[in-house]
Every structure is written in C-alpha cells, then in structure tokens.
Curated annotation (Swiss-Prot):
The lineage of its organism: Bacteria, Pseudomonadati, Pseudomonadota, Gammaproteobacteria, Enterobacterales. It comes from Klebsiella pneumoniae (strain 342). InterPro entries: UPF0270 (IPR010648), YehU-like_sf (IPR036685). HAMAP family: UPF0270. This is UPF0270 protein KPK_0377. Pfam families: UPF0270. Belongs to the UPF0270 family. NCBIfam families: PRK04966.1.
Length: 72
C-alpha cells in the first residue's frame, strides 16, 4: 500500500528517508556525497512522484521504492 509522503510529519519523513539511504549504501561514484544531499535527492524523487513510500502489511515495514517497480 502506498503511503502519501505528504501525510507524514516532516521529521518522521526525514527519519524514514535517512534510514533508507543508510540501508541502501549506494555508491555515488568518484566523489562521496553527504547524507544530507542523499536525503534531499530521495525527497525530491518522492515530490516528483518517481519514488513512493510503501507499507508492507506482511512485514509491517515501510520502504521507499521506484514507482515503476510498485505492484500494489
């Protein structure tokens, strides 16, 4: 189930995004990017509708994923 990111408290949203970014451990190439920059990038993807917050009833967890991969 998609959770509208706009419905979350801003601090809660930031914490979810930060947790996601730290969990992903993505390599950003030759230059390391700050956590704040990575969080801002994910937030922009949510705002543009490229990414969505997804609640898993089975696992009782929230995840962020590309909208194109969501099969809900």
């Amino acid at each position: 189930m998609i959770i509208p990111w706009q419905d979350l408290d801003p601090e809660t949203l930031d914490n979810l995004i930060e947790s996601f970014v730290l969990r992903e451990g993505t390599d950003y190439g030759e230059h390391e990017r700050s956590l704040a920059d990575k969080v801002a990038d994910v937030k922009q993807q949510l705002k543009r509708g490229e990414a969505v917050l997804v609640w898993s009833e089975l696992h009782e967890t929230v995840n962020i994923m590309p909208r194109a991969l969501f099969n809900g």
